[in-house]
């Protein structure tokens, strides 16, 4: 359950400081201070134009670094994406593939719809992914269930034309093949125009080849189930069988009818899919089974080939997620040996990470939380060298320059509210060199030659900007300056843009909790209601950062609300001790820390203490329920969007990571559930859910509704036909927020 924040760009980013820092005030030269006031409206915030400006997605550099490609929303439809290309030498840009020109508009297969939900792109249309050929001369483009090959001169060749659709398409490492999954089997097609051939043929029913199982996609950030060797001699292929996985009957209730799906859903404590790994040639011959150990009840976490293709690295995670073994596999025999093992503490778990890199000399750059914080290590010839250390976190691995002996990574060494790009020596521990400017939330990717960086950044007053930089972090050119100047969609609203304030509180155990706040212009003596937004869950990025929070919080401030967020114990990027406090105790310290935030708000002279509304989605929706149940009278009203109400209903990998096996620790599940005490809720509640949600099933909300109805406990409810976990889309997002704010106006603002 990665964070779901409903609304427009309500992604954690921004802001806030009254207790510890001074509020940020726009400088005289800041356009915020000089623009003419024009108030935000529902139509502006939720209309076809993204007020945060043009936001390219899936930015990539071509293998030779001369071309920058991205997916961009159309001017008239921000949910439809086209493929664009920009010459990094001249800055010239052009649309490379027009999604409307080649798209058929065909309905996607149910398998592809579910994959898109797992990747959090379910609401996007047009071109949502692409893959460069290794020579950089062509690009594989999937659209509307079929595959196309685009060349740099704008010509497009159709590769497939089938009713079933293709999943997980890639160009092989040397450009010889396009590979994809169709009808639960792996296929390859020579790019020279030869016939498509099946690599596997046994897929069907409950058996899948080349795909990632549900929990791998949803909870492990693993999207594929096959991996080419660098020389194209072999392909490693996952096989999974869902025969023993519980069949959940899910009704997708739409506007004109209901479809019933028999979805294989591994709820906590129930069997997972049986997973095996094979290595074979691209024609399916010479198949060998990889030895994953005697215990079949494990997770296939990550699979990677060594740079020279001599072996396979496989990360095997135990079912309880307290042990992870790094296996080296012989591709000729499938035999595996353990290179090293990571183990969690007694009241902890292991977080998976993509921050690792195999080097040509046989060593490995590896992120571990073994010292209590996520740091980089080098594993060479059986010995470990710690490359970064301290009470801060490495958040991602960006690139490795083996020739110059440098590792590039993102982290929060400088400021826990800021993410920066750093470099450090490979050979020894040294002080990291920061390569990005203070005051921003940054992310970065790097080209294969480790000479160019794509850096994205934002701040509370500046929507996301993207620039091209050299390996020293020096900006070479803007990719998307996105300056809020005349012509920018947000420019008319700058004069009313309010500064974001940051501050800190102390939790009951002395932990520092960071908060952010946006207020309306404050009139002396007046008290204001609070829109208290929360997520609160583990395993995701923090919510309180110095990044752009989008126009919605500003809209709320213009509507007279104070917008407030606080990061509680149990959340990510603060070290394991901070995160581990929710172990076998969900809905405990998170609720306590949100209460500390509410009590702090009530101490402020400009806050109306009887008018604090709370809102959350997904884990945040669960938190809304728990906050009302545990703290009656504190919150004037709550909105619970797509909440998990009973953790026994949620999936294995996420839930068991934090609560364990429900058969072994039923008390943790009982104490963490929200449905049991729903009838105790006495404050106004609005329950919201998508009626086709395949992640947090609608059953979670109907269980709460039934419990409250049985006890004659009043509440309000809004369910969205055809909508999945991310409720939104044209018209729907505006309806959602009109519903939320209409409810809060009645129950909070107008409260006597």
Regions found by a protein language model. Give the residues of each.
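Bacterial N-terminal signal peptides that target proteins for export
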Residues: 1-5
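Beta-propeller folds
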Residues: 7-13, 17-446, 451-464, 468-469
